[in-house]
């Protein structure tokens, strides 16, 4: 009957969802709301949702952009299993091939819509070294340092003995305090577990700080508390100087129809995105959106800049330029916090 058929279909869908949840190790997240998931957890959930349809080909657009290194390695291992065990063809676009490079059967480099290189991973890396393409900086460190272009730690280990290390620079004296957290406790709901518990720290002027941690460890939550967007239920936040936040979902900042209505022309020029001035901000790529959002944050003139994944979606050359820009800001007395 029709009713029995509907029941069977629902059971089949539920069974397939359960299989995908187990394959991607998502069982601990099944009772969570999607809004409470971290960026990396949402990415894994999206991949699992795509696989419920049993596709033969997966097209993934920057799938590792929101993943920490440990989660990225796990994600890539899942993709490798999908390819090797289930025969799924995987085509992945990325600005940072990194660990994925060694697992690929072939790599294609696009420049202005044209294919400038297509080869196996090692030949691809050698071609980048010979051409001096800016994407060279996106290769694993070993492939940049050595002519043998090792793509994995195992390949690079025999060559590491030839390296000589420089001593680390002496630490600079601390400046004035620009942000202080004292015994901060935060939870998204009254009966939920604490995301931040009795956290204390002090930031000083002219420094660049990094916040690292696995997906779901509370990095973005901490930035939200620092910025005053999220209110802790216990503890104290002191912000004696103006503070600006670049959120993980940068599109929340876009309230105008043109980029040049959001960011000053001089800032667009400094960030190398003046050509985007007349574009609609919601039509931009992920990396372009991050740079426009960063421009908006810089235009506030705030002394403390809280940047959540500012390099997500940026290619190697753009990352290097952004790093130089941030170092210049710190030298000018700004405080930068990076997730």
Residue ranges and their predicted role:
Residues 94-95:
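H-loop/switch region of ABC-family ATPase nucleotide-binding domains
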Residues 12-29, 264-278, 295:
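Conserved ABC ATPase "signature" region
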Residues 1-8:
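Short, small-residue-biased leader/transition segments that mark boundaries at the very start
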Residues 58-61, 305-308:
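Catalytic Walker B motif of ABC-type/P-loop ATPase nucleotide-binding domains
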Residues 50-51, 298:
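ABC ATPase C-loop
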Residues 212-214:
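The feature captures the beta-strand-to-loop junction immediately N-terminal to the Walker
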Residues 33-37, 41, 280-284, 288:
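Conserved ABC ATPase signature
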Residues 110, 114-145:
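Conserved beta-strand-loop-alpha-helix hinge in the C-terminal portion
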């Amino acid at each position: 009957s029709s009713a029995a058929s509907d029941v069977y279909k629902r059971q089949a869908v539920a069974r397939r969802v359960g299989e995908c949840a187990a394959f991607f190790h998502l069982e601990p997240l099944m009772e969570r709301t999607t809004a409470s998931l971290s960026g990396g957890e949402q990415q894994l959930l999206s991949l699992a949702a795509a696989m419920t349809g049993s596709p033969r080909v997966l097209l993934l657009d920057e799938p590792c952009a929101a993943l920490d290194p440990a989660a990225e390695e796990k994600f890539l291992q899942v993709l490798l299993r999908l390819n090797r065990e289930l025969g799924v063809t995987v085509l992945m676009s990325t600005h940072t091939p990194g660990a994925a490079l060694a697992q690929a059967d072939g790599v294609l480099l696009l420049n202005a819509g044209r294919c400038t290189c297509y080869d196996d991973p090692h030949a691809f890396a050698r071609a980048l070294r010979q051409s001096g393409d800016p994407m060279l900086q996106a290769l694993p460190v070993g492939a940049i340092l050595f002519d043998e272009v090792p793509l994995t730690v195992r390949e690079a280990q025999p060559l590491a003995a030839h390296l000589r290390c420089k001593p680390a620079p002496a630490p600079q004296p601390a400046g004035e305090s620009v942000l202080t957290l004292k015994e901060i406790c935060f939870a998204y709901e009254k009966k939920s577990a604490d995301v931040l518990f009795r956290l204390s720290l002090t930031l000083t002027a002219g420094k660049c700080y990094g916040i690292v941690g696995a997906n779901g460890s509370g990095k973005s939550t901490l930035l939200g508390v620092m910025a005053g967007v999220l209110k802790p239920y216990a503890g104290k936040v002191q912000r004696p100087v103006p503070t600006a936040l670049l959120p993980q979902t940068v599109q929340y900042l876009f309230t105008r129809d043109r980029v040049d209505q959001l960011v000053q022309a001089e800032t667009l020029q400094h960030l190398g995105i003046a050509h985007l001035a007349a574009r609609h901000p919601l039509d931009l790529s992920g990396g372009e959106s991050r740079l426009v959002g960063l421009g908006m944050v810089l235009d506030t003139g705030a002394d403390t800049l809280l940047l959540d994944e500012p390099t997500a979606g940026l290619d190697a050359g753009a990352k290097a330029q952004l790093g130089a820009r941030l170092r210049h800001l710190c030298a000018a007395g700004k405080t930068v916090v990076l997730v």
